[in-house]
Amino acid sequence: MGLMIRSSSIHAAGCYTTSRIAKGVQVVEYTGPRITKQEADARFRNSPTTYLFGIGDGSTVIDGHGTAMYINHSCDPNCETEELDGRVWVMSLRAIAPGEELTYDYNLYDGDEDDARCHCGARNCRQTMYSSEEIARQKKALKQKARRAVEAKRRKAAAVTQAKKGGKAASRSNARKKATRR
């Protein structure tokens, strides 16, 4: 199958087909060294660009090398990934014309501070490469963080109010003691 790497309007470089691809075909394998997620996190902590692909339960990662690592994300993809016998294949979802850029939905699942902005330009673009499940998880975590911040602020305000009341009470008590000593 003829594939080539060239400039992409989605992101830097992309993978394009030079021949027609039928629906349901194994287009290319996602290859590279397999490392643990912890090793990948440490190795790529400060790297703005990675070609990592989580497999199995997500504890193992393929550090992408080869043609498949240039396949960009799209919210309206023409391919999908499938794990078969421990190997990751990019499969065509529909017939793909020669010259068309290959894409699949990354469905990122382990978000951090990065918003993983999507630039696919699809009509149904969700503006991020995170999966719907990860988006929901991040929103829930953000709400919990906001609730904790509000609760902490409320506790601090209550403590300040209590301290002011305690201070006044102590002052009145000291004034009474002084008055009775005379």
Where are these predicted regions, by residue range?
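Catalytic cores of histone-lysine modification enzymes
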Residues: 1-82
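C-terminal SET catalytic tail plus cysteine-rich post-SET Zn-binding segment of SAM-dependent SET-domain
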Residues: 75-182
